Amino acid sequence: MLKLFSAFRKNKIWDFNGGIHPPEMKTQSNGTPLRQVPLAQRFVIPLKQHIGAEGELCVSVGDNVLRGQPLTRGRGKMLPVHAPTSGTVTAIAPHSTAHPSALAELSVIIDADGEDCWIPRDGWADYRSRSREELIERIHQFGVAGLGGAGFPTGVKLQGGGDKIETLIINAAECEPYITADDRLMQDCAAQVVEGIRILAHILQPREILIGIEDNKPQAISMLRAVLADSHDISLRVIPTKYPSGGAKQLTYILTGKQVPHGGRSSDIGVLMQNVGTAYAVKRAVIDGEPITERVVTLTGEAIARPGNVWARLGTPVRHLLNDAGFCPSADQMVIMGGPLMGFTLPWLDVPVVKITNCLLAPSANELGEPQEEQSCIRCSACADACPADLLPQQLYWFSKGQQHDKATTHNIADCIECGACAWVCPSNIPLVQYFRQEKAEIAAIRQEEKRAAEAKARFEARQARLEREKAARLERHKSAAVQPAAKDKDAIAAALARVKEKQAQATQPIVIKAGERPDNSAIIAAREARKAQARAKQAELQQTNDAATVADPRKTAVEAAIARAKARKLEQQQANAEPEQQVDPRKAAVEAAIARAKARKLEQQQANAEPEEQVDPRKAAVEAAIARAKARKLEQQQANAEPEEQIDPRKAAVEAAIARAKARKLEQQQQANAEPEEQVDPRKAAVEAAIARAKARKLEQQQQANAEPEEQVDPRKAAVEAAIARAKARKLEQQQANAEPEEQIDPRKAAVAAAIARAQAKKAAQQKVVNED
């Protein structure tokens, strides 16, 4: 009795809620054996034919490749793709792929050479001697992925299962009403399928192996039973036909009675599921050493003349397969990749066959009926009754349409397997699956953005923490550097402080004068001398600063000198071209000569105070001096040739002479105050200039005496008064100069010139006095 009960439990199956029973159309294609399709002229191999990232390219344009040669490298979850035939790589560019929107993905385009040569194949017939890791790596590098429709890398799936897998389930249900690829594969290659199952069992070491197959495949069931006749480790479970019993969660519940938790995987409950086609691909990869380059594809529909199942090379254009099967398209012909419930309509027929392509359906206009117009939801709950995942499709529809992503997530939209049962039974013809696909894509995009934001935040926080640690370490180093001085340093500091205090005490001690002793004033004298020296140094610095600020630019000075020379030449030409009647006023000439001499002295001082770097060209200086002497001689000649009728008023001349002396004294004082103590005067030059000035003064007096009119008389008393005033002013000036500070130096040249002028004026006054007495 106990054995009977155990046997009953062993073969027990469960039933899931919901599901539908659409009309079956499998007989269109499952009656003919598998056949090969002629090679296409061009193959388009997308680099991404699986869930995950695309691999790294290992070929380039112009390379010759063989069948089975890797086109990409598989690292991590990146699954490699292989050349479906031998030929030449003509392009590597984006190309539209098997997607509802025909999205362009990077693809390798190969022109076949028609030879279909394989790479050297190394099979592992003794795979049981290989380790688990070696087998998983070989399966991964040979490009094996889930061929049931998901496209998940098989090697990654086996690696993730680990040692916690207790039940291995082989999915042979194939519940779509048109698809017969697995059915025909089990009929024609049952032994190879079972061998692939044994390889998977060797890797996972499960306690039980279950094959789930629907009862609408009698030929496949009989072939499997024949192969498993002597096997006791693999159980074949025949289940009732119900859509979608081929779903992973639904088949797991049917065979084990266990439900996969929301948001979880079947491996969480110790179950791992593989497709029949995947098992066959594993066998070819491990034992035969052949990468996956082809798969079984169902060609069905009333628009195809020769429906059936074919071995289609990956990368073959869909148009090539349909034309080989006798495709007769209508005006508004549609082609569906996949079944009528879970498939999608191809936007055009040049997309390639990929690893997840299991069916190409070309229905006629009457086969699927006219598309119905979408209407409003009537809340009939028929979709909820048909949902195999126990969801509320009508609520998910409203949430998806209203962009309420949080509520859609709360209502477990991620558990939707997109089987299309809800849309099949909907009386309002609402394409619910399309809404759910779009909502899940938007939620995935939001989650990805949140993930990137979280990663960015983590990086920012890590950076802030690192900066804080560096700051704390830096402060700690500063604190450790600011330690107390050593004992010897303390002694040195104390000694220095003692010396400072001693000096301060000595400075503040009063000076005591004892009777009979002279006081020691050396400290006071030294302090006074130091203060004087400091004051002189400050005054010298201030004087240097003022001199540097007032130094003329040598270039500007040269320009001004050139302009003055040009004006002088122009004046000479005008004077030379003047009429003989036009005479020169001696007073104006004397004034101009005095102004010219003053400007010359000022220019000499500016040049003397210029920076030592700027040097004066001696040749230019000599030329300018010669020009000045020539101008002076010419002026003297003009004065000598003046008309005798024009006379000079002695009183006006005396007044002008007094004004000139006052201006000269003021200019001398300014020049003495601004003069550098370093400037020295050559006594010989001063004597020469004084002699020249005296000679000119005598000559001028003689001219004035000769030109003076006898009729004009000068008052002797006024002249005597003016002479006395001049002598008094001269004495006062001498006293002021004698009382000046010893630091101020008098320019000998200026003094000589002033003395000569004074003597000339005195002589002139005396001569005028003698003339008046006569």
Curated annotation (Swiss-Prot):
It comes from Escherichia coli O6:K15:H31 (strain 536 / UPEC). It is a peripheral membrane protein. It is found in: Cell inner membrane. This is Ion-translocating oxidoreductase complex subunit C. [4Fe-4S] cluster 1 binds at residues 377, 380, 383, 426. Its cofactor is [4Fe-4S] cluster. Its EC number is 7.-.-.-. GO terms for biological process: electron transport chain. The keyword Translocase applies. Keywords: 4Fe-4S, Cell inner membrane, Cell membrane, Electron transport, Iron, Iron-sulfur, Membrane, Metal-binding, Repeat, Translocase, Transport. GO terms for molecular function: 4 iron, 4 sulfur cluster binding; electron transfer activity; metal ion binding. Binds 2 [4Fe-4S] clusters per subunit. GO terms for cellular component: plasma membrane. [4Fe-4S] cluster 2 binds at residues 387, 416, 419, 422. It is an enzyme of class 7 (translocase). Pfam families: Complex1_51K, Fer4_7, RnfC_N, SLBB. Residues 369-397, 407-436 form the 4Fe-4S ferredoxin-type domain. Residues 602-750 are annotated as: Disordered.
